[in-house]
């Protein structure tokens, strides 16, 4: 009898507590914590409507959620910049999905990270360093992880200071660029630097100029281009290619079928490799590699390699690149800078640039939709 009475008393008590928890209370708790509506209602019920105690309950459960998300891969996200005077910073903060990267709460958080990084005592952090600890944002990160519901990661930041600094954000934050210059200043130079930042975002140079490359880097580039040419006999100078073909025929390296194909199409060497077997082309490459010393000493071959090295340098060195806004489609970035400097009455030079592209170098998680749904239901 007493057990039945106690049971009904508990039900009545729960109803009273539930009735006392108003929609306004749930809304207030949601706004202060960012937690879901049902989580807020449950926390208020557990604490008999005590707002501070409910916040503690959500924090404790949230901490568990943060720990659970820690093992996930965060390779999406955005970049943001902040600047003050002649100093600017670019940051990259990662999320698990590009959907979250478009979230206003996440974007506001990343801007807060940029503002904090601008005032940091170090100019650069990342590559395994604890950026979160450096910026003293551990609690902020945990809070946003709870609110957003995904693993978030403060990956890296870098600051630049110069006589003139410009920034550019591309694709809603997919790429963030900083450029610092020394020499002339003013609105025209600032505009030119912004244009150059756009150039860097689009063309992804690796160096400011070829003078910034070490002798070892240039030698390595040449070696790669030589190796590529030897492995692709179709692109070799005609005299060298003819010698390799003669050797393939005379030494019976080629099959009778490939020799017959060559005899049929040798009058039009430009299309020969469209008809030769893959095996025949591979055999020519092997012959070229075996005769590397002779071929690499050939003046014609060296001319080909130098041409390809020069072309590659025009792609990876900012000053050598064709300026993306060039009206004639030919003007280099170096000539554009000289033109702006002349008009400004004083020269300026690029001191340094930083380019962050979201997720570069990070592992990305690939799951099919069914697997993703199944994982969420577990």
Feature locations, PLM:
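N-terminal assembly/interaction segments in proteins that build large macromolecular machines
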Residues: 10-11, 15, 19-378
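Aromatic (phenylalanine/tyrosine) cluster motif
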Residues: 2, 7-10
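Accessible peptide chain termini
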Residues: 1-2, 18
């Amino acid at each position: 009898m007493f057990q039945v009475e106690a049971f009904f008393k508990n039900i009545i008590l729960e109803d009273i507590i539930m009735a006392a928890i108003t929609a306004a209370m749930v809304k207030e708790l949601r706004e202060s914590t960012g937690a879901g509506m049902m989580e807020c209602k449950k926390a208020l019920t557990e604490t008999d409507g005590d707002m501070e105690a409910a916040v503690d309950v959500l924090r404790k459960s949230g901490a568990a959620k943060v720990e659970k998300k820690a093992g996930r891969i965060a390779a999406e996200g955005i970049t943001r910049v902040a600047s003050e005077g002649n100093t600017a910073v670019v940051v990259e903060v990662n999320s698990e999905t590009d959907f979250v990267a478009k979230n206003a709460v996440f974007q506001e958080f990343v801007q807060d990270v940029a503002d904090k990084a601008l005032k940091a005592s170090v100019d650069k952090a990342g590559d395994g360093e604890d950026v979160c600890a450096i910026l003293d944002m551990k609690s902020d990160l945990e809070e946003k992880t709870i609110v957003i519901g995904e693993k978030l990661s403060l990956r890296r930041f870098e600051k630049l200071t110069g006589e003139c600094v410009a920034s550019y954000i591309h694709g809603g934050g997919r790429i963030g660029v900083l450029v610092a210059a020394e020499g002339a200043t003013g609105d025209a130079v600032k505009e030119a630097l912004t244009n150059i930042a756009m150039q860097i975002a689009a063309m992804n140079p690796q160096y400011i100029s070829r003078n910034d490359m070490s002798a070892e880097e240039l030698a390595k580039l040449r070696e790669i281009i030589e190796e590529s040419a030897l492995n692709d006999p179709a692109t070799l100078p005609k005299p060298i290619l003819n010698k390799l073909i003669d050797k393939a025929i005379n030494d019976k390296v080629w099959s009778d079928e490939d020799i017959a194909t060559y005899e049929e199409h040798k009058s039009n060497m430009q299309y020969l490799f469209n008809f030769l077997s893959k095996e025949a082309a591979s055999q020519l490459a092997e012959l070229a590699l075996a005769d590397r010393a002779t071929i690499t000493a050939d003046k014609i071959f060296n001319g080909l390699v130098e041409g390809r090295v020069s072309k590659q340098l025009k792609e990876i060195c900012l000053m050598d690149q064709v300026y993306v806004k060039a009206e004639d489609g030919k003007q280099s970035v170096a000539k554009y800078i000289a033109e702006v400097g002349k008009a400004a009455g004083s020269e300026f030079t690029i001191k340094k640039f930083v380019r962050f592209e979201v997720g570069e170098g990070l592992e990305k998680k690939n799951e099919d939709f069914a697997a993703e749904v199944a994982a969420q239901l577990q």
